[in-house]
From Swiss-Prot:
GO CC field: extracellular region
Originating organism: Eurycotis floridana
Name the UniProt record assigns to this protein: Periviscerokinin-2.1
Domain of life: Eukaryota
Cell location: Secreted
Family: Belongs to the periviscerokinin family.
Amino acid sequence: GGSSGLISVPRV
């Protein structure tokens, strides 16, 4: 996944 600051998002 990818992390940006305090938000982590699952790479799809």
